[in-house]
Design a protein with these regions (language model features):
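Short loop/turn microsegments at loop-to-beta-strand junctions
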Residues: 9, 165-166, 186
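A generic fold-level signal
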Residues: 134, 161-163, 183
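A short, N-terminal "cap"/entry segment at the start of jelly-roll beta-barrel domains
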Residues: 141-178
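Glycine- and acidic-residue-biased ligand/ion/polar-headgroup-sensing regions
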Residues: 184-192
Length: 192
């Protein structure tokens, strides 16, 4: 039997957890179809989109283990319409259809579950592992607030003025900062 899996998401931006999910799906299934949620869905979920749908589709298409990327009607905040479309295209005598979720969504309730059960679409939870490797929302938040990772910890620009920046530094236990000399700026430190 030919095995097809449908995955869906905003992928805004794609991160290593998504890549693990795609590779895991490609290892287990003959065909990987990725449904790309709309800009409107991202706005409903996150307030706005980071990348356009065309850019996200271009990135996903370039990932070698994905066979096709599809846009679909997600006005009900689910990918049921995509599943319905793919289900209608396949030969049920020769093909088994699966709906997959990443590791961070394993064994939970989700909008598509009842539809899948009614249509005989099998569910594969936990693709790519069962721990959340990253978050598109965290990536965007860290980028927008200016979080910079360092070997000793990280710093965040809390407030920026024309001639001054206020930074919060988090030094990991057992680590120390490097000594630096600045010719064009002064630093004041408040330690708590």
């Amino acid at each position: 039997m030919h095995k097809i899996i449908v995955l869906s998401g905003g992928f805004d931006p794609v991160h290593e957890g998504h890549i693990s999910m795609f590779h895991d799906a490609a290892d287990k299934y003959d065909e990987v179809i990725v449904g790309l949620n709309s800009q409107e869905w991202l706005e409903r979920k996150k307030g706005r989109a980071f990348m356009s749908d065309q850019t996200r589709a271009c990135v996903l298409t370039a990932i070698g283990c994905i066979d096709s990327v599809r846009f679909f009607d997600d006005s009900d905040n689910s990918c049921i319409e995509l599943l319905r479309e793919v289900h209608s295209e396949i030969d049920l005598d020769t093909t088994i259809l699966y709906f997959g979720n990443g590791g961070d969504r394993a064994h939970g309730n989700f909008a598509e579950k009842e539809f899948c059960e009614a249509q005989g679409i099998r569910i594969d939870d936990g693709l790519g592992g069962t721990s959340k490797q990253n978050s598109s929302s965290d990536i965007i938040q860290n980028w927008s607030i200016g979080k910079a990772e360092r070997v000793w910890g990280h710093w965040i620009v809390a407030k920026s003025y024309p001639n001054c920046k206020i930074k919060e530094l988090v030094v990991n236990p057992g680590c120390t900062l490097s000594w630096q000399k600045h010719n064009h700026r002064a630093e004041e430190w408040f330690v708590r």
